Amino acid sequence: MKQLLFCIFLLLLGGCSSNQPPAVSGQIDELPAIYPDYTGVTVPQSIAPLNFAVRTEGKTCAVFTTEGYTFTVYASDGAFSIPNADWNKLLIAAKGKQVEISVLTEEKGKWKAFLPFHIRVSEDPVDPYIAYRLIAPGYQLWNEMGIYQRELASFDQEPILENRLTNNNCINCHSFCMQDPNKMLFHVRAKYGCTVLVDDDRIKTLDTKTDQTISALV
């Protein structure tokens, strides 16, 4: 038991020490080339972590700082995956203020810092969800698609409708009435071609096929 506790202690100690920024021995007089480019943007105070990648070789780290809170994220491949817990604490502390992000890169055993960039945190929360159609790039695999919703405070995604339930046909052109998630319409093509109207728990289908169109909606 003592050995187990000692190992746990070492793991915790290592986690704390690895979260500290390294000593900086030089400055790079330019902003880091990051993707996506979040430089100078304003974000809602409940947005999911803004993970990003930096175009540089070797070890890198990013130091996130606001009044009252700071943490460091390390990356061996230049891609930063920001921990949810640290990010949420940062946004709470930075509400109505800004976050400074310093990217450091290691060269020959010494760390150099790019010029910092900033993200402003709004006092307004983000809308809970965004809805979208998900389909493979280029539309080659159009027979595998669906309409999904993602929680914007996280990366949780769940289907509203997947076309595997409708004979793998095309589903498109969805919209909501005045941003009301309880009032929605979308179009279905091919075998079950129609417009689907959703009003709370009431669902209605409309056949818009005419003699002058090749199918419903077209």
Question: Which positions does each model-derived feature cover?
Answer:
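Sec-dependent N-terminal signal peptides
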Residues: 4-13
